[in-house]
Amino acid sequence: MLSNPIGISGGLDKHAEIPDALFDTGPAVVEVGGTTPLPQEGNPRPRVFRLPSQNAMINRYGLNSKGADHMSELLQQRVREFAYAQGFGEHELAEQRVLDGLAGVPPGSLVPGKLLAVQIAKNKATADADIEAVKRDYVYCVDRLARYADIMVVNVSSPNTPGLRDLQATAPLTAILRAVVGAAKGVDRQTKPFVMVKVSPDEDSDQQVSGICDAVWGSGVDGVIVGNTTNHRPEPQPKGITLPEQEQNALTQTGGYSGPQLFDRTVALVARYRALLDAPHMPEVAKRMQAQTAIATEAEPNREDVPSVDGGAPVDKYGGKTIFASGGITNGEQARTALDAGASVAMMYTGVVYGGVGTVTRVKQEMRQK
């Protein structure tokens, strides 16, 4: 059972250096990454711009990454230190015992009631048109990292990697996701990681959303994270209000926009994905997840007094695919609205950047008061 329905989105811990510190701030889900197979520098600096008057940001990091091997080493060391602390020893068998669940905690988060998501992407140098090469990039990441994750997140939606969003078309997306699902099923661990795909808020036409849903069902992934940063910019300021010159300049920068102004769009898109991913398609993966999980209707005495997600995986009350909402969520009322629209988890990034380490605690308190 997830202890609460709040998560921290990828980007705050790009290299999986501080997952435990992020868990300590209170979320039930922490997403690290995104990482690429090989190290890459990302885009030149400056590549992040703040808009304090809007509590918003524009970034064009370009998936700067130390590579999947580096992240794997960090996560493996984390598991081995946990195994030693729990009395399993410090050898390879001790690591395997923890990964197989003998410590009584999820093998990724290592914390009861919480899940670690690892976001993966292709290298910028890998040609978008070469789907076999793209698949190899994602599978390489799965092979290195899935042992240490509860959820693998397939990022095909960063606006800062040229051509990446083209992979959200139905045919290439289905092929990529099938490859990732197949690799995840082969992980040497008692329980296999779940697979989710992170989609763009800009791919929002009926045809695009429907095509992505077809790929989700056709590939067997377990859910969707809606969404990512957007290439769109907020509506102009009301008449008589002038942005500081620095922020006016920031709005002209190339990159993905994130902040509270995304919220309405995120909720609307969550509702659309929920409608399309509901019961009419019910292949075996949905039945499996429905049998394993559901939203808890009452908090257990030793659980946090916020909505809990039952089961060992991030799944909702709808009996189909899981949806995480990500984009513009900054308070408890918005988190509740995202859940009511069809999400199981409300994730935050920019809200945490501006709100600090107490943000998740505040949001959960606000949810309790509703």
Placement of each model-derived feature along the sequence:
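Glycine-rich phosphate-binding active-site loops on the catalytic face of alpha/beta enzymes
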Residues: 26-38, 220-233, 329, 335-364
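N-terminal capping/small domains of soluble enzymes
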Residues: 1-81, 122-124
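Active-site beta->alpha loop and helix N-cap motifs at the rims of alpha/beta catalytic domains
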Residues: 48, 54-153, 158
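Intrinsically disordered, low-complexity domain-flanking/linker segments in eukaryotic proteins
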Residues: 82-111, 279-320
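Glycine/Thr-rich beta-alpha phosphate-binding loop at enzyme active sites
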Residues: 159-172, 208, 215-313, 355-363
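Active-site glycine- and acidic-residue-rich loops that bind
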Residues: 10, 123-139, 165-173, 195-217
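Catalytic cores of alpha/beta
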Residues: 13-24, 136, 203-217, 308-318, ...
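C-terminal helical cap(s) of enzyme catalytic domains, especially alpha/beta-barrels
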Residues: 42-55, 234-255, 339-340, 345, ...
